[in-house]
A protein has these predicted regions:
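DUTPase catalytic domain/fold
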Residues: 1-185
C-alpha cells in the first residue's frame, strides 16, 4: 500500500516557547483532520509563523526573513524535497513578494528555513491609528504572522506535520544547513 500523505517534521529553534505553541496547535489540528478524514478538502500547505517582528524597507529586494524552524519531509520513508510558497494573503494584502517566486528546499537540507522577500511598496504610508505626521517607509511583518507556506512536491497528498523536540529527529543529511545559493551559482 502506498503512503497517503507526506510527513513534515518541524523543529522549533532556540526554545522559542510561544512559537512552539503555535506549531503544536497547528500540528494537532492538521493531524486530526487527516486521521479522522474530516475533510476531503485538506489544505495543500502548512503555514509558517514569523518568529519575530521584521521591518522590510520599501523598494528593497531579497530581504532574508528567518523562520526560526528546521524541517525535513518524507514520503514512504524516503526523504523528499519540498517547496516554500507565498500564502495567497501575501499577494492580496501586502506589498511583499518572494524574491525567487518559489523556494525549493532540497531533501537533504537541514538548516533554518527562511524566506527572501521583496517589498514592492514605493509609497510612504501613514500607519493606521497613528499620528497623522507619522509616516513609515517600511512594511512590518509582526511576530506570529503567516506569510509563507510549505507545500509537498505532489499537491495531491496532504502533509502530516509532526513537531519534534530534538533537531536530530529530522534525520541525517550529507547536505547539512547551507542554503540560498550555497551549492553554486
Amino acid at each position: 500500500m502506498s503512503p497517503s500523505y507526506y510527513i513534515l517534521k518541524i523543529y522549533v529553534m532556540n526554545n522559542d516557547f510561544p512559537l512552539k505553541e503555535k506549531y503544536s496547535k497547528m500540528c494537532v489540528q492538521k493531524q486530526r483532520i487527516i486521521e479522522e478524514s474530516i475533510s476531503s478538502n485538506i489544505d495543500c500547505g502548512i503555514d509558517l509563523f514569523c518568529p519575530n517582528d521584521v521591518k522590510i524597507k520599501n523598494s528593497s529586494l531579497s530581504n532574508k526573513v528567518p523562520m526560526g524552524i528546521k524541517c525535513s519531509m518524507t514520503f514512504g520513508g524516503m526523504f523528499s524535497g519540498y517547496y516554500l510558497y507565498p500564502r495567497s494573503s501575501m499577494g492580496a494584502k501586502t506589498p511583499l513578494r518572494l524574491s525567487n517566486s518559489v523556494g525549493i528546499i532540497d531533501a537533504g537540507y537541514r538548516g533554518e528555513l527562511g524566506a527572501l522577500l521583496d517589498n514592492h511598496d514605493k509609497v510612504k504610508r501613514k500607519a493606521q491609528g497613528m499620528d497623522e505626521n507619522a509616516i513609515f517607509n517600511y512594511y512590518t511583518i509582526e511576530k506570529g504572522d503567516r506569510i509563507v507556506q510549505i507545500c509537498s512536491p505532489n499537491l495531491t497528498y496532504p502533509i502530516y506535520p509532526i513537531l519534534v523536540n530534538n533537531e536530530n529527529e529530522l534525520g541525517e543529511s550529507i547536505r547539512g544547513s547551507d542554503g540560498f545559493g550555497s551549492t553554486g551559482r
